[in-house]
Amino acid sequence: MLVQNNKNQCKDNNLLHVSHFVGLSGVGGVQRNFVEYINSRTVLESDSSFFHKIYTLGSVDSQYKLKKEVFDIKRLTNLLSLILDITSRNKIVHFYNNLTSIKVVIFLFLLPVHNLILHERGVIWNLPYFRRPLLLFVIWKARLVLTNSNATKIMLEKKFNITSKKVRVIHNGINTKVKCTKKKLLHDKSSIFHIGFIGRLDTPKGVHVLIEAMRHLVGKNIELVIAGDGILEYFLKKQAKDYKNISFIGRVENPYRFLSSIELLVVPSIREPLGNVCLEAGLCRIPVLAANIDGIPEIIENKVTGELINATDRISIYMPEGAVPLPNFVVNPTNQQLQIPRQINPLLLARKILELSEKPALLEYYAENLHSKVMDYFNIDRFSSELHAVYREINTSKSITHKIDN
């Protein structure tokens, strides 16, 4: 892990101090988005009005090359430092995906909290309703709750009857300076059409549906490459063992290298608060075929930046111990209401993959439109700008409140 600890910034009392508490031991959209933000030019170079300090619990995954020091609160001195930051009137503390944590509830109950931001990115899908009082307490303690999508905000509002004006949407952004060179792939009838999936091999991702779809595509010059690992890996490999058109390559360190080697990304999710992988595909000009569920349509506009398939089938998946449970509800993006989770019909998915494999011009159209959308809106600079505006807003309001109290 690279470490860049700017001691001069610590000494400058004019800087707005922001402490981040985020889990960095796992692999997911929360971690990738945070690392890209904290390593961005806006944070490291351009914007000298902030001092950022990072806290975590446990180890940092080797995939994340952070350019700032990370403080593990398993060490007592670091835990005490975080507590002092939380109780300070002069510092903002930003928690990521901790809205449903019992430990956080206890933590906040015991401490006076002044400038806390909670960033919710999807864990509430599986939060039982009986824990609503705890959720309300945590939101009450916070100055603001940020969500990564309108779908996440809707889940808070519809499932838990949260109508707080504290909830605000800031869509994720990615580093658009990353080089992602798409392979020059052949489109003649004899060439193989490469499709891919990348992500955790767990219940919400719906990979079992994609494998079943490939059963209908045997002999069609279409091959699926699955990148990722997880608790369902053994069972998915068992499901796919008789299909020579499917290969598993395990977890990849560089998702852009993987994306640049395929012609179509398939996202068959059962639950997906936003879908960061769609943004990464867009940067690489890789078209996306995805489930029309939750926050995915906030990135993929059907027939414009990709294609969406409605999830209509009852879910049939083996659930080993330790797998992420299915949520009680997901967000229907068409009517903005909650519905029982469903999966894509495998035969319908197979037909759509086959259809798109025969339309390279259409895929190119989707890819260019998605690329433009990512470059224009879903970029890390826009994300940073909106987030820093929130920090300044809280800093201004806390200064006014402090003067009134005095």
Describe the role of every protein-language-model region.
Residues V18-F21, H187-K205, L210-M214, Q337:
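Conserved donor-binding/catalytic core segment of Leloir-type glycosyltransferases
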Residues A151, G173:
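Carbohydrate-associated surface elements
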